[in-house]
C-alpha cells in the first residue's frame, strides 16, 4: 500500500465533486503517502480525517492521525503493531499483561466524531461521504464495554499472545466480535443522524468491504465462520 495515485487519476471523489457534491473521506487511506500526489485532498476529497500510514493503521491507538494534510499528534505512545509480542515472562492469562495495548485515544472514536461533524456541516447541500473504517481489521482492540459483553457470552478463552503477527489480546474471539458490534453501533448512529436531519430518504448508502477472511492477528476466521 501507499504507492500514490497519479495526479490525473479519475477517482470517485473527483467524479462527485464534478457533479456538485462536497466530498469527505474518513478512516484509512492507502493510496498516497503524505506529501505525494495521492493524498485524499489531491484526489477529489474536500475533507479528510484519519490514517495515512499503513503501519500505524494496524493499531487503534496510533500516535497521530491526519486532518486533511496536517499530522495531528495524539496522546498515545508509539507502538509497533507488528513487533510487540507479549512481554517475556508475562502471564498470558492475566488481563493486566495486556494493559499497555489499550491507551487513551481510540482512533475510531475520533474518526467517527469528525465524520458526524462533516454531515452536520454539509446537511443542507449535496455531500458524498466515504467512510473507510479500519474496523474490524486487526490488531484486536475494541471498547471494553463491548469486549466484556462478549466475554460474558463466550466465557473464558485462550489468549492470543502475538504469535501470528499484530498485537496480543487476552480475549481474541470476544474482541473481534466486539469490533464488529461497535462498527454496527456506529452505523446505526449515522443512520439515526440522517433520519433526524431528514436526509435518510434522499441518501444512497452503499456498504462494501475489501477485507475477506483473515488468518492472522488472532482473528481466527474458522472459528468465526463456524457460527
Predicted feature descriptions by range:
Residues 1-227:
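Formylglycine-dependent sulfatase
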Amino acid at each position: 500500500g501507499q504507492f500514490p495515485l497519479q495526479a490525473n487519476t479519475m477517482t470517485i471523489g473527483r467524479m462527485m465533486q464534478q457533479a456538485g457534491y462536497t466530498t469527505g473521506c474518513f478512516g484509512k487511506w492507502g493510496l498516497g503517502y503524505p506529501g505525494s500526489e495521492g493524498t485524499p485532498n489531491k484526489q477529489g476529497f474536500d475533507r479528510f480525517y484519519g490514517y495515512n500510514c499503513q503501519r500505524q493503521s494496524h493499531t487503534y491507538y496510533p500516535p497521530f492521525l491526519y486532518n486533511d494534510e496536517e499530522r495531528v499528534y495524539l496522546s498515545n505512545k508509539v507502538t509497533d503493531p507488528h513487533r510487540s509480542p507479549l512481554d517475556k515472562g508475562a502471564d498470558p492469562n492475566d488481563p493486566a499483561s495486556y494493559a499497555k495495548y489499550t491507551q487513551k485515544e481510540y482512533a475510531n472514536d475520533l474518526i467517527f466524531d469528525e465524520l458526524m461533524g462533516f454531515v452536520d456541516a454539509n446537511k443542507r447541500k449535496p455531500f458524498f461521504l466515504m467512510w473507510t473504517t479500519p474496523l474490524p481489521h486487526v490488531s484486536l482492540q475494541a471498547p471494553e464495554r463491548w469486549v466484556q459483553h462478549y466475554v460474558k457470552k463466550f466465557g473464558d478463552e485462550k489468549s492470543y499472545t502475538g504469535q501470528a503477527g499484530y498485537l496480543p489480546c487476552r480475549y481474541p474471539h470476544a474482541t473481534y466480535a466486539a469490533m464488529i458490534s461497535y462498527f454496527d453501533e456506529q452505523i446505526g448512529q449515522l443512520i439515526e443522524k440522517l433520519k433526524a436531519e431528514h436526509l435518510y430518504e434522499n441518501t444512497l448508502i452503499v456498504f462494501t468491504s475489501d477485507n475477506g477472511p483473515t488468518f492472522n492477528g488472532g482473528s481466527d476466521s474458522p472459528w468465526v465462520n463456524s457460527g
